UniProtKB/Swiss-Prot annotation:
It comes from Neorickettsia sennetsu (strain ATCC VR-367 / Miyayama) (Ehrlichia sennetsu). Keywords: Ribonucleoprotein, Ribosomal protein, RNA-binding, rRNA-binding. One of the primary rRNA binding proteins. Required for association of the 30S and 50S subunits to form the 70S ribosome, for tRNA binding and peptide bond formation. It has been suggested to have peptidyltransferase activity; this is somewhat controversial. Makes several contacts with the 16S rRNA in the 70S ribosome. One of its GO terms (cellular component) is large ribosomal subunit. The keyword S-adenosyl-L-methionine does not apply. This is Large ribosomal subunit protein uL2.
Amino acid sequence: MPVKNLKPFNASSRGAVLVDYSELWRGSPEKKLLLPKKSCSGRNNAGRITVRHRGGRGKVRYRLISFSRFSSGAPLFTKAVVERIEYDPNRTAFIALVRDFKTGLPSYIIAPEGLKKSDVLSTDVFDDMAPGACMPLGKVPLGTTVHNVELKPGAGGQLVRSAGSSARVIARDGNYTLVTLPSGEKRLILSTCHATIGAVSNADRKNTKLGKAGRSRWLGRRPSVRGVAMNPVDHPMGGGEGKTSGGRHPVSPWGFPTKGKKTRDPNKLSSKFIKSKKR
């Protein structure tokens, strides 16, 4: 999906670069696949802020996405046709409404790049390499770009789901397949785990510029205040006479080193599946 540069009608449109949604579905979403979504504004069940800089966005409804193409061990569909591509306010990627050829049941999936209306999607058809086809990693040819990758067979895709992201199948080792993730990390994943062919849609999102603070607020993002601009009671780097640099190496509001300090547990069980760290 291309981006559009707004003309400088006013200060907020000057320099703004937004995704062009003109090719997306303009009607209502599929009612059967909607759930109410309550905004918690970054608070937990005790009402305390656990995620900062969240809150104040417009009301949205959650779209039920089929991250797994299977239900109770059986495929949701073997063949399905794409009815339309839609905007989803809950994620950066676009979503596709697909309908099963046999039962006519609708489903939402993450739309891969290049998918369009009337395309036919397949599940476990191993000779179909079209974008949106789903199959086990063990059946994906080496060098193929994939997304929505499972970590456990049947659990649904957990990796590579954001706009424009993709992973690449590069090798096989026994019951495992070596996959290069968007971070550059090379990880072994069970060959029986499913993945979807192609890269995720809306790759141009990385080129956008919101142009004004209000657009961030529409998305539920509240302002982020620098620690050195706070008082000592609010942040370890706060206080001082005049403008100061904080007086110490950068830390989080809770005193943990930030700016690149590695926090992963070296004894984590999944470390044995990681063959190469992030670039």
